[in-house]
Regions:
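Radical SAM enzyme core and accessory elements
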Residues: 1-9, 45-50, 62, 66-76, ...
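Acidic, low-complexity intrinsically disordered segments
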Residues: 1-221, 225-228
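Hydrophobic/aromatic residues located in beta-strands of well-ordered beta-sheets
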Residues: 7, 108, 233, 263, ...
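Flexible glycine/acidic-rich beta-alpha junction loops that bind and position SAM and/or redox cofactors
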Residues: 15-19, 114-118, 194, 244-245, ...
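Radical SAM [4Fe-4S] cluster-binding motif and immediate context
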Residues: 32, 164-330, 340, 355
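Acidic-and-aromatic substrate-binding clefts and catalytic sites of carbohydrate-active enzymes
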Residues: 57-64, 87, 241-245, 269-274, ...
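Short, electropositive alpha-helical surface patch
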Residues: 64, 248-255, 345-363
Length: 509
């Protein structure tokens, strides 16, 4: 670490299913580092700036943060805060207030893909993929003109776009204290070629090959393996298998690595079922853990949101994929994601879906979300889905929840109750009904019936990091174990060790 830092970026996530982000004693620290923070740091370093990233910020004590910052912060050009989701935990709010008082001359910048960043008291906000916007801000901090903005919000979907981008490399430093058992996030492309009606992702309907170069992927994975021993990745692309040509491009590069990566990714199930030519290339890459956004096995319901493959064909195709990967890859994990409440979906058709999953997919994973429709009104940076904008055109009407008689104790997952209470009290989402079902009955079904489904392996492939930090856990365990505890002690041991290593290093600067 240089003695003079140009910027310090704070980031971190909490696994917050019950409001724990606002509790001082929260222990639900995510193993995941600040994806955007490290992306920005890498890009600014490539442009000549010295940037430090402070991960797991929710776990730090305010006195530890002060101790860490005092030797290195006085000449900073900015303090940054970045998170995919909420950042306003008590320690972060206290840190922001202290920075404002202690370093009033140093601007504070928050970046995110959603409106949550504006809960923090900042001088600037960077909305969207922010590499180029941050570079413009750095020029401004060096004495140049202000970037284009509205009320100090830089909209990176309009100005200073950083998509598509040929090089999406993240490069870690010695002062990041990387553990070889971490599951790192990796990005192959930005945006999605599809336009599913429930999707509120910001960049949809892209054309052509918008992915990064194969060489940059090879170089990033080689560096992470050579320096830190990293072999495991979570692919954060909206849809990875949108193009056979793209898959082949990356498979040919990754096959040359001196190790076999192990990765999990969002995979569109209907495309995978109809393109057997992609299967071996995915195996070459090590993408043998899949998250399938099937949404519904009611053909009319799936077709209404842009996924129209015949139900029998998608079911048979998924079973063929499972058998092929288990036979030829030696490892396979597939999670089917469903949405209760789509047009034409009834409670009875949901029961049929769960019966199929119980019979044919119980050795894997499946989960069911509730359709959420935002109540539009106050201005927000959040993107809106087609359903959010035009829900009445799809047969939805506003309703009210009846008296709550849901048997909440039947579900071991607290997420449903937290979501129900949020919808009922926040005023941010519509309590909807249509001609086929209503939101309340979907909650009741998910809690009282779906939660009782025959499901041997409930491990979400995107939650592996909470188990894998335990050295005794093998990658193959995720496909075979029927239940795994969160490994909280291992997570906190890693995070607390990271904090102590950062403090020790800063004390020597």
């Amino acid at each position: 670490m240089a003695e003079i830092m140009d910027g310090i970026i704070f980031g971190g996530q909490l696994e917050d299913f019950a409001g724990s982000i606002h509790k001082e004693d929260s222990k639900n620290i995510s193993m995941r580092r600040s994806s955007g923070g490290h992306k920005i740091a890498t890009f600014l370093r490539q442009n000549g700036y010295e940037i430090d990233v402070v991960d797991y910020v929710h776990r730090w004590k305010i006195e530890q943060l002060k101790q860490y910052l005092k030797p290195i912060a006085k000449d900073c050009k900015f303090f940054g805060f970045g998170s995919t989701f909420f950042l306003d935990s008590p320690v972060v709010k206290e840190l922001v207030a202290w920075l404002k008082e202690e370093y009033p001359h140093i601007p504070r910048v928050a970046g995110s893909q959603n409106d949550s960043m504006r809960s923090l008291d900042m001088d600037w906000y960077v909305y969207g993929y922010g590499e180029n916007a941050m570079l413009e801000l750095m020029k401004h901090f060096d004495g140049g003109p202000e970037p284009i903005h509205f009320n100090k919000v830089i909209n990176c979907y309009v100005n200073y776009k950083s998509f598509p981008k040929e090089d999406l490399t993240v490069s870690y430093q010695e002062t990041d204290f990387v553990n070889p058992r971490e599951i790192m996030m990796i990005e192959f492309a930005r945006g999605c070629k599809f336009k599913c009606k429930f999707c509120s992702f910001p960049i949809l309907g892209v054309k052509g090959d918008y992915s990064r170069t194969a060489q940059s992927v090879y170089d990033e994975m080689s560096e992470n393996y050579d320096k830190w021993g990293i072999e495991h990745y979570l692919v954060i692309d909206e849809t990875f298998n949108d193009s056979s040509e793209k898959i082949e491009k990356f498979a040919n590069a990754i096959e040359k690595l001196p190790f076999q990566p192990k990765m999990t990714a969002f995979i569109r199930g209907d495309l995978l079922a109809s393109r057997p030519r992609d299967w071996d290339n995915l195996i070459k890459m090590g993408i043998t853990s899949h998250f399938y956004g099937i949404e519904s096995m009611n053909h009319k319901a799936a077709k209404s949101v842009g996924k129209g493959m015949n139900t029998g064909r998608i079911q048979d195709g998924l079973l063929e994929v499972k058998e092929y990967f288990q036979t030829n890859a030696g490892y396979y994990k597939g999670l089917i994601s469903l949405i209760a409440g789509l047009p034409y979906e009834t409670i009875d058709s949901l029961r049929e879906t769960v019966r199929w999953c119980s019979e044919y997919w119980s050795d894997q994973s499946y989960h069911m979300n509730i359709l959420m429709i935002k109540l539009l009104g106050k201005p927000s940076l959040n993107h809106n889905s087609e359903f959010d904008l035009n829900w009445k055109d799809y047969g939805y009407r506003e309703s009210q929840f009846p008296k709550d008689d849901i048997k909440w104790d039947m579900s071991i997952n607290p997420f449903y109750k937290f979501l129900y209470e949020y919808v009922a009290t926040s005023g941010e989402y519509i309590m909807w009904e249509n001609d086929y079902t209503n939101m309340y009955d979907c909650f009741k079904f998910c809690v009282e019936e779906f939660s009782q489904a025959k499901l041997k392996n409930a491990l979400d492939p995107f939650m592996y990091d909470k188990f894998f930090i335990d050295p005794s856990v093998k990658w193959s365990d995720f496909a075979t174990k029927t239940h795994m505890e969160r490994r909280e002690s291992h997570i906190l041991e890693h995070v607390d060790g990271y904090i102590q290593s950062k403090l020790s290093f800063a004390s020597r600067v």
